[in-house]
Amino acid sequence: MRIGTGYDLHRLVKGRRLVLGGVALPFEKGLDGHSDADVLVHAVCDALLGAAGLGDIGDHFPDTDARFKGVSSLLLLTETGRMLKEKGFFVVNIDATVLAQAPKLGAHKAAMAANMATALGIDAACVNVKATTTEGLDAVGRGEAMAAMSVALIIEEEARDSRGQGAG
């Protein structure tokens, strides 16, 4: 059994689409970044890569690589899942939290979880998404940025339980 954590933060800017968990959200600003800047998916990728001892998102999908310019972060997550499977790991569960002052995300959390589960080929019940504000404090609270953090539990494929939960 292995556990990894992930964290990401991106600045909010005008003129960009806001994407969280692969869901395009109506909002006056979007996250600035090389890919679609989906902080939620980036944090999940980092948690999974860390749990597997495979470094971090920047090692595999650097912002200096033109192949990843504007790409959907769900594609990065799919590739992360492939790397884990190749190393013999099975995703048991993911728990992630988005930190954002606005917009309200409650109505979108299930779709975000479903998108990430689909990208990884796991049951949506194995992915949990939460959202919170920072009560007006820091860059997130001032509406200048959004952040996300995640924890992931993985096991070696041989240890996979008979219920068939997780990846694979």
Swiss-Prot record:
TM region positions: none
Keywords: Isoprene biosynthesis, Lyase, Metal-binding
PANTHER family xref list: 2-C-METHYL-D-ERYTHRITOL 2,4-CYCLODIPHOSPHATE SYNTHASE, CHLOROPLASTIC
Catalytic activity annotation: 4-CDP-2-C-methyl-D-erythritol 2-phosphate = 2-C-methyl-D-erythritol 2,4-cyclic diphosphate + CMP
GO BP, one annotated term: isopentenyl diphosphate biosynthetic process, methylerythritol 4-phosphate pathway
Named cofactor requirement(s): a divalent metal cation
Gene3D superfamilies found in the cross-reference section: 2-C-methyl-D-erythritol 2,4-cyclodiphosphate synthase
Chain residues that bind 4-CDP-2-C-methyl-D-erythritol 2-phosphate: 8-10, 34-35, 56-58, 61-65, 132-135, 142
Subunit organization: Homotrimer.
Source species: Desulfosudis oleivorans (strain DSM 6200 / JCM 39069 / Hxd3) (Desulfococcus oleovorans)
Binding site for a divalent metal cation: D8, H10, H42
NCBIfam families per the UniProt record, alphabetical: ispF (TIGR00151)
Enzyme Commission identifier(s): 4.6.1.12
Cofactor info, note text: Binds 1 divalent metal cation per subunit.
Name of the protein: 2-C-methyl-D-erythritol 2,4-cyclodiphosphate synthase
Pfam family, any one: YgbB
